[in-house]
């Protein structure tokens, strides 16, 4: 086994990876996922999600290329099912989510739709929208910037500290590991 403590799972993802993490959050208790993984649903249930400018919707504001890559020939058949704002239930885990106002690749509407769906189901969510910042940034500082400086977005830099505080507050078992700057 992987020695994973089933009650201590936090999933995270950026952009299309955010869609993957959020998919686990909304589909963890489905028979379909249990069949795919061969595991009991409770063993794969995330306790929380950290979603970083995630692809969420195949709707008007969706990132169609991501959905076409994900669904291939079954795009028309599955695009609504994989629009995660429609899949949130009372069993979806609490969520930390952030985005940037300037993101022109995955539009802000994606997180707005997901946060609204979480709110309507009574799922606790911490949501941050930073005024500046391109798509595809990591820690938004020199640690994750590429060699020509792309990836530095000072307005977004607080996201990792905010996420750490959220983890410590929401999950008492969290070890409080800090990312060195």
Model feature map: region roles:
Residues 112-181:
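C-terminal catalytic histidine-bearing segment of alpha/beta-hydrolase fold enzymes
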Residues 50, 96-98, 128:
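Hydrophobic/aromatic beta-strand patches that form the interior of the parallel beta-sheet core
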Residues 101-104, 132-134:
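Acidic beta-to-alpha connecting loop that harbors the catalytic carboxylate
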Residues 9, 95, 125:
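Hydrophobic anchor at the start of a short beta-strand
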Residues 1-65, 75, 79-80, 84, ...:
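Primarily recognizes the serine-hydrolase "nucleophile elbow" in alpha/beta-hydrolase
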Residues 104-113:
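Conserved alpha/beta-hydrolase "acid-adjacent" motif
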Residues 84-92:
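Conserved serine/cysteine hydrolase catalytic core
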Residues 91, 96-99, 103:
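Short beta-strand/loop motif that positions the catalytic acidic residue
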């Amino acid at each position: 086994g992987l020695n994973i403590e089933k009650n201590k799972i936090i999933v995270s993802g950026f952009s299309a990876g955010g869609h993957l993490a959020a998919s686990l959050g909304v589909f963890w208790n489905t028979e379909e996922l249990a069949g795919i993984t061969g595991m009991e649903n409770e063993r794969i249930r995330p306790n929380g999600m950290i979603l970083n400018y995630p692809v969420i919707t195949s709707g008007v504001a969706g990132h169609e290329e991501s959905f076409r890559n994900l669904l291939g020939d079954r795009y028309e058949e599955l695009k609504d099912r994989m629009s995660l704002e429609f899949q949130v239930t009372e069993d979806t885990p609490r969520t930390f989510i952030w985005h940037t106002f300037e993101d022109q690749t995955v539009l802000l509407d994606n997180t707005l739709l997901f946060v609204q769906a979480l709110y309507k189901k009574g799922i606790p969510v911490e949501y941050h929208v930073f005024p500046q910042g391109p798509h595809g940034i990591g820690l938004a500082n020199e640690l994750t910037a590429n060699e020509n400086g792309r990836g530095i977005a000072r307005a977004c830099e607080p996201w990792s500290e905010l996420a750490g505080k959220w983890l410590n507050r929401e999950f008492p078992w969290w070890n409080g590991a800090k990312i060195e700057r």
